[in-house]
UniProtKB/Swiss-Prot annotation:
The keyword Iron does not apply. The keyword Electron transport applies. Disulfide bonds join C90-C93. Its main location: mitochondrion. The lineage of its organism: Eukaryota, Metazoa, Chordata, Craniata, Vertebrata. It comes from Homo sapiens. It is linked to Combined oxidative phosphorylation deficiency 29: An autosomal recessive, infantile-onset, neurodegenerative disorder characterized by decreased activities of mitochondrial respiratory complexes I and III, severe cerebellar atrophy, epilepsy, dystonia, optic atrophy, and peripheral neuropathy. The modification N6-succinyllysine is found at K152. The gene is TXN2. This is Thioredoxin, mitochondrial. GO terms for cellular component: mitochondrial matrix; mitochondrion; nucleolus. The modification N6-acetyllysine is found at K152. It is found in: Mitochondrion. The record marks D84 as: Deprotonates C-terminal active site Cys.
Length: 166
């Protein structure tokens, strides 16, 4: 319920206003912007404490939603992509995921990371021959250029990323 309300507020603010330099408009609903009268005759006025400001950030990691999303954001990407095939129940995935995200973020946009849950996207796991998790693919111009299975330390991950970037 709270997520739906927050999404509704966000969409209302994005549609009604253009973002200012470096910031999104405040997340408020139209109900909070204009006074409302209730059946009891009470007037509700906007509460400034409910205004939320956000800043624009560059996302280097994203979750794949479906096959066409994978095609669009990974295969057709001009930026090299690290694809992390993982599962919620996988212990090593929970260690590698944050470590890999941190290393990708250090590359400042030279590479991005796509996360694919194999339980939700078994078709992609089969297509890319994922037989164990975590499996990480390095993709450039739609082609798999490197791959590893299992956990790697930060030095090995850095070498993997440098090889992908070129």
């Amino acid at each position: 319920m709270a997520q739906r309300l927050l999404l509704r507020r966000f969409l209302a603010s994005v549609i009604s206003r253009k973002p200012s330099q470096g910031q999104w408009p405040p997340l408020t609903s139209r109900a909070l912007q204009t006074p409302q009268c209730s059946p009891g005759g009470l007037t509700v006025t906007p509460n400034p404490a409910r205004t939320i400001y956000t800043t624009r950030i560059s996302l280097t990691t994203f979750n794949i939603q479906d096959g066409p999303d994978f095609q669009d954001r990974v295969v057709n990407s001009e930026t090299p992509v690290v694809v992390d095939f993982h599962a919620q129940w996988c212990g090593p995935c929970k260690i590698l995921g944050p470590r890999l995200e941190k290393m990708v973020a250090k590359q400042h946009g030279k590479v991005v990371m796509a996360k694919v849950d194999i339980d939700d996207h078994t078709d992609l796991a089969i297509e890319y021959e994922v037989s164990a998790v975590p499996t990480v693919l390095a993709m450039k111009n739609g082609d798999v250029v490197d791959k590893f299975v299992g956990i790697k330390d930060e030095d090995q991950l850095e070498a993997f990323l440098k090889k992908l970037i070129g």
